[in-house]
Design a protein with these regions (language model features):
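Beta-rich carbohydrate-recognition and catalytic domains
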Residues: 1-121, 125-144
Length: 144
């Protein structure tokens, strides 16, 4: 079997530091890691998408950041548009953020696991049976 690699968008990055520079957050464009692209399922109505023409969501992060970012596109090759760029300078940015608690970034889950410091490398899957998205990510935890 022979495989062929095809670069999208003419070989240009689909997410670039310039996107963050254009919204006044150049530091957020210094590390763009762990991309995960999903094609939106037919069962997700256009009214529930971040934009009616959105067909693809791209999840990514800063390797040492405290939030998971997202961009959307009508075509897998782009152009991609940052999700909620107006929130980049305040709490609640991206699609998942470690909240600041007593001066530290941390989140405690119901099972006692605490994620702190940073989150990165989102791996998003569509669970068609339960009609939901499932995100895995890495971060520092209190478990061994």
């Amino acid at each position: 079997m022979t495989y062929r690699v095809l670069r999208l968008a003419g070989g240009r990055p689909i997410i670039s530091p310039r996107m963050f520079e254009s919204i006044g957050a150049p530091e957020d464009g210094t590390s763009i890691n762990g991309p995960s692209v999903i094609r939106l399922p037919e069962w997700l109505d256009a009214s529930r998408r971040v934009h009616p023409s959105a067909r693809y969501y791209l999840y990514f992060s800063h390797h040492n950041g405290w939030y998971i970012r997202m961009a959307w596109s009508a075509d897998v090759a782009g152009p991609y548009h940052l999700y909620q760029p107006e929130t980049i300078h305040r709490a609640g940015r991206g699609v998942f953020e470690l909240p600041e608690v007593a001066g530290a970034r941390r989140l405690q889950f119901g099972n006692g696991v605490v994620v702190h410091g940073h989150v990165a490398s989102p791996d998003v899957h569509v669970d068609h049976r339960n009609r939901r998205f499932v995100m895995y990510f890495h971060g520092i935890t209190n478990t061994t």
